[in-house]
């Protein structure tokens, strides 16, 4: 397709990575928009793209200004089966097609305000958890893919998969489009929920057709990079080549179990004390780069200022700062303009690097005990349903939680 007159054609995702460029992803939309009052915690579905497009558009713009050069469509959990799961009924009230189309239109509009690409994204499905067949699950992915092709997204992402089997199905469905495919799993160093190690997960994803592989969500930057390192080693052992990608949480989760932060008792409404600072994220960006990761972004908890931290840390490699850095002094240097002298004394890198941050909660523990129910595909509690969760089903879960907590 010829470029529009007067507009310079953008380099594609693989062209950028082949040239050695650092690609910066965006942050966590469902958490950010839930805090702002546009997404409902629980289903975490993206109907805000239709109901509140201005809110979604503004968040895209803030990530773009912060340094993101990929606008992921706000299509996380936008599969038909998720939009009608457990009494949600979004698919009936709005339709999955409208949600996906609106998300693509918003992402494209903002991407074209800068040098950003649009990535159409799919994620794990209730159908897989309910033991539906490969044919049925792939059909769900193809429904979203039809919209992505119609809207001509630049590349595709299969993200947030706990089971490599389903992730492979997603990659295979997306790869049929002919567009580049990235694939990220929400796993830690222990591997997927069926016990498949990270290295083997990466190998399977690349063999399925993914050009970019890595992790997103569920774990903090440190743990996520441990997992990416294992993926890298697996690919090297298999003599396979792929670009590496990392989009972790912006929460510290050293105490979580195999299922990541969703196992923590603070999930999702008590995570604020765990939020990573901008300086934590600068450290993450440097460590990711040194590991060989060239697609670096974030997931839940990542706000625009976190993305700006990535862009600022990697400005020497990228050759420029993002527009949002106009209002941010490097390592707190802008504090030299403060009225209070003890605040001016904090206008230096050494202060912020060495600060041991207090929580302000004197009687609270620093770590939690994960719930760790250990359920995965095939477990009765994970069988999904179109109807709303019943009071009886909730009572049974409440009793099980009491039992687990007492162990």
Swiss-Prot record:
Q: EC number(s)?
A: 2.1.1.5
Top-level division of the source organism's lineage:
Eukaryota
Enzyme class, spelled out: transferase
Q: Which cofactor does it need?
A: Zn(2+)
Biological process annotations from GO? amino-acid betaine catabolic process; methionine biosynthetic process; methylation
Q: Where is each Hcy-binding domain found? A: 11-314
**Any idea where this protein resides?**
Cytoplasm, Cytosol; Nucleus
**Residues recorded with modification Phosphoserine:** 330
* InterPro entries on file: Betaine-hCys_S-MeTrfase_BHMT, BHMT, HCY_dom, HCY_dom_sf
GO cellular component assignments: cytosol; nucleus
Binding annotation for Zn(2+): 217, 299-300
Q: In which pathway does it act?
A: Amine and polyamine degradation; betaine degradation; sarcosine from betaine: step 1/2; Amino-acid biosynthesis; L-methionine biosynthesis via de novo pathway; L-methionine from L-homocysteine (BhmT route): step 1/1
Specify the protein name.
Betaine--homocysteine S-methyltransferase 1
Q: List the source organism.
A: Mus musculus
